[in-house]
Regions:
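Ligand-binding clefts/hinges and TM-proximal coupling segments of bilobed small-molecule sensing domains
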Residues: 70, 147-164, 202-206, 235-261
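Alpha-to-beta junction loops
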Residues: 68-70, 86-95, 139, 177-190
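Extracytoplasmic small-molecule ligand-binding "clamshell" domains
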Residues: 26-96, 105, 243, 252, ...
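Bilobed "Venus flytrap"/periplasmic-binding protein-like clamshell domains
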Residues: 33, 38-41, 52-65, 98, ...
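A ligand-binding cleft/hinge motif common to bilobed small-molecule-binding domains
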Residues: 79-83, 95-106, 151-154, 182-214
Length: 261
């Protein structure tokens, strides 16, 4: 009888483990569709083979691994991200989207992923800075739907600055090089690695002082109703920060602290 009971206990344990396997596998095959605009190296950009790579992508892939899901990267224009999220064409936005009060009225955000300063880029020797007074009458390019556009419209336009919005950041750079605009406002890292460190950016540099957009850093945008997904991603981010994985990923791209306070 004793051996029979032991066998029953072992059998019950094995059956319990077997029953757990489909649940794990189901979680592992779950797909999270991240919307991204691959025009922001080193955050996200198209590789020669057509795949999307960058800091955001590496962070997203690690998050998916930790929540036992598979990432699917959906290429979208930045200005169309929130509408696509509401239309359920994507599950989340991971594309250097700053956490702002205006956006928080429409969607939820995860905890912060990173936080960078913003700068003005112009041709070397430009006789203006990043303050509204010196920019009066100038044409400044920004990406449509970005926090840079919001800042420029509220802080500069009332003082006579002409703000030109573009669908993509590469279009901003193209018009800057061709002289159609006098300057561009964007994130420091995207400006430095995506333009100034490239051949077409050799005649340009930062002008004026760094600017604060009033945001709370960059997070992952999620529908407000997706409470469970947000909680699981927040837990993944916290564990990445705690075990050093976040720092290891960041060091692939940057030599400075990307997270901030």
């Amino acid at each position: 009888v004793k051996k029979f009971l032991q066998a029953m206990m072992i059998g019950t344990t094995v059956m319990s483990l077997v029953c757990m396997v489909p649940t794990v596998r189901a979680n592992e095959t779950r797909v999270v569709r991240f919307g991204t605009d691959p025009n922001y190296p080193p955050m996200e950009a198209k590789a020669p083979d057509g795949s999307i790579r960058g800091f955001d992508v590496d962070l997203g892939d690690e998050i998916c691994r930790r929540i036992r899901a598979r990432c699917r990267w959906v290429e979208l224009e930045f200005s169309g991200m929130i509408p696509a999220l509401h239309a359920r064409k994507i599950d989340a936005i991971l594309s250097s989207m700053a956490i702002t009060e205006k956006r928080a009225q429409q969607i939820a955000f995860t905890s912060k992923l990173y936080q960078f300063k913003s700068r003005m880029v112009a041709r070397k020797g430009a006789a203006f800075g990043s303050d509204a007074k010196s920019l009066a009458g100038k044409r400044i390019g920004v990406q449509s739907g970005s926090q840079f556009e919001s800042y420029a419209l509220t802080q500069w336009v009332p003082h006579g600055v002409n703000v030109v919005a573009y669908k993509g950041q590469n279009e901003v750079f193209a018009d800057l090089v061709n002289g159609r605009i006098d300057g561009a406002l964007l994130g420091t890292v995207e400006a430095d690695q995506g333009f100034l460190d490239t051949p077409r950016g050799k005649d340009f540099g930062f002008v004026g002082s760094a600017l604060s957009m009033g945001d709370k850093g960059v997070g992952i945008g999620i529908r407000k109703s997706d409470v469970a997904l947000r909680a699981s991603i927040d837990a993944a981010i916290a564990s990445m920060l705690a075990d050093g994985t976040y720092t290891r990923i960041a060091r692939r791209y940057f030599s400075f602290d990307t997270y901030g306070d």
